[in-house]
Amino acid sequence: MGTVTSEPTTADSPPPDGGRTPGSSRLGGRLSRLYGPLLAFLVTSGAFCAAWAARGSFPFGNTGRAINDQANQYVPFHRALWDLVHGQASGDVLFSWSGGFGQQFLSDYYTYLGNPFSWLAVLVPRAHVDLAVFAITPVTMGAAAALMTVYLGKLQPGPWWQRGVLGAVYGLCGWALSDASYIPMWLWGLVALPLLGIAVEWCLEQRRWPGVALFVALAWFGNFYTAMMATMAACVLLAVRLITLDLTGAQRLRALWRAASATAVGILLTLPLLLPSFLSSGAAQPTKTAAFDPVRIEVFLAGMLPATHLWGGRPRLYVASLGLILAGSFLFNTAIAKKTRLVWAAATLLVVASFQFPPTQYVWHGLAVPNGNPYREAFVFSGMVVIVAWLALANRPRLLHLALAAALLVAATFVLRRTDDFGGWTWPAVLGGGAVSLLALTLLALGERRRVLVPVAAALMVAVVFAESTVAAANADARRARERWAKPAATSSRSITEHWQAVRQVDGWPAYRTDPGAPQTSYNDGLALRAQGPQYYSSYLPEATYQALEPLGYGYKNDGRTFFGADNPVLDAIFSIGARVRPGATPGSWTATRSPAPPLVTVRPATPYTSPHPADSVYARQETVLGATVYEVPEVTRGGTATAQTYAAQCTPGSEAYWYSPELYGTLHAGATRRQLEDRMSGVLPLGPVPASGRLEVTVDTRTSGADAGAHPIGCLDRPALDAAVGHLTATGATKVTAGGHTIEATLPKGSTGTAVLAVTAVPGWQCSAPVRPFHGLLAVPLPPDTDKVSCTFTPKGLTPGLAAAVLALLTLLAVPLTHRLRRRRERG
């Protein structure tokens, strides 16, 4: 391998060794290397933001920007990151007290905050964190485009502006504009692919082994799934390069060894995040699994057409017309060695075919059934298309071949025009974008003789990629908005600000918890509003939390990975909720109220209490955990029809009536009270005071077939009995509670005996001053004689071995270059 020269290398020659330019031009040369990446970044981020503005999305208009999990997870988790960095969180990086009554945070951090650009959120005021989250998308896409520009230059030298334009084509691929546009951690996979491509080239050049390991670690720190996909893509790139380059067998083996060893060390560096997340996933509440069902072939192929957005979870495989036309001319380009053309074409074809074959699709997803969009690896194909497009462009494609590729694109669009949901901006992108792209490439070819045409060609190429991608992004937003799940949600408003302020007015953590109430702004209002209620939505919600909260009457969805609050004073007493926020009298306003609550740590007698009411009643289960009889659970008379069900019961006048029917969806009427029932999402609902007659009559208009409210849907709360129970738990409970980031310590009254019960679900990872024992899903510790303090510490499962492995990897990372230096010194000596 020789040094870098100004002569272009052919596509099948060995890679350069990265020699340096001597003399005073070194600084200028280094600066000029930034032109291409900078162009790619500006075109990519600019096009996406232009589409953002064209749609009138916040802050360019009044349309909400956050959709689906962006509103429910990503913005709240970034607000939690802001709190953590600014020292205002009720928890730390290992554990959070804000949501789910206390949950691990490390796995959530890795999964939802792994994109390094997520740290932009901590640089703005908390009220504007949502804007920072939205900005992560164009910044990450721009970074991916810039890195692809660098990678293309390592594959084959060429003009910086041409590489920059094709880098932007990659950054603006259909997957990024649609499926990943609102998912910050997925977008890091777009960065990881060219990052690992550069690492592959270093392995082939037999240099920068530590840099390769660090690049692998950087890719895997972002997001497990997309990092795994990018790593598999890097394996494909390495295989292609090993086949096409003129290398000896020894060189190939050394490159393989460097790649394998650096990958292992890089992944081990991420093990403190990766291993706890893997174990948390195993301990999470199970969800329903579905088999991968490939889309029809015409739908799959239509996903490759520019600016195409088909309904639902269909693949977004396209890049801009310029990239498709160049890629289409690749096989015809005789300036490229035949072997190189065949190997790259075969690799690209095999990659895209693997998306439709269930066994290989499972491999792309880590041997798991794809959850959500099944084609989240589509960016890999887009990257391959851009690579072959660059190899074609760098080797001066003939105009006839370009015209033939453009004609094939138009013909394919015509054939696929009747595909279900075909439409939008596909034809304008193919005809308009394709024509301008072909014109630009024609001018570029003519520019070999008339240099004045080259700047015109460059301007046209930049303009067509920018315009076509802007249209594609806006089209993706508009067509996606037709789907119910994608309805944009507000993440900043006067109501949200007042909600936040109301929570702050009554915050008393850790003396008591504050429930942010309903209606909720997001599924993670505990994190978003810095409260401590049960509201929590995470892929890592533990099965132990589900088993603790579901029997008590908390509403949930997503198979139990999302929990909601419940306005119920018995549950408030169980979980030490001493403050609650509710909507105010005027729209958008919120009011906060305080109520007596036991401390977070209470003392229960050695002999467990059992409710006298029917065991299948949610009210009996609440009483058993509370340790006192506070409800009247009457027999219910059922009447009406299947769709208009009636229920009647007799309770003590003046008591407070509650309703629980997790199987019914519809509308409930009880006197002047009207409630929406959303089956398992609703939880326990208040009906109001029992009238003087003592008779309760409830009507449920339901659309749920073959279901009813069960045997004991009504419970009537005896408020004085509850007050007495709260008073007893307060008098015998902890006199002082201190909650650290992932620790809790309680001082108990002298002479306490029995069991100390912490108002925390017994999730894996807790270690206490005495052996932990279960108490109806809550954390509990037996009290030996003369015990006056109880303390517990949370450590995520897998953190300790993960840290040990990372330290070993770090030592290896430091030892390799040190050993190399010592060897060179000895050779010189």
Functional labels for PLM-detected ranges:
Residues F48-M148, A168, L172-G189, R296-G303, ...:
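Membrane-interface coil-to-helix junctions
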Residues F41-G99, R254-E298, R479-R484, R504-V506:
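Aromatic-rich transmembrane-lumenal/periplasmic boundary elements in polytopic membrane proteins
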Residues A346, L350, A368, P374-S492, ...:
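Contiguous transmembrane helix-bundle modules in multi-pass membrane proteins
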Residues A467-R484, R504-L571, P605-A615, V763-P764:
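Extracytoplasmic/lumenal acceptor-recognition loop(s) of multi-pass membrane glycoenzymes
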Residues M141-L155, W160-L245, R258-S277:
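Membrane-embedded helix bundles of polyisoprenyl
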Residues M1-S57, R258, A459-L460, T812-G829:
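Start-transfer (signal-anchor) and selected internal transmembrane alpha helices
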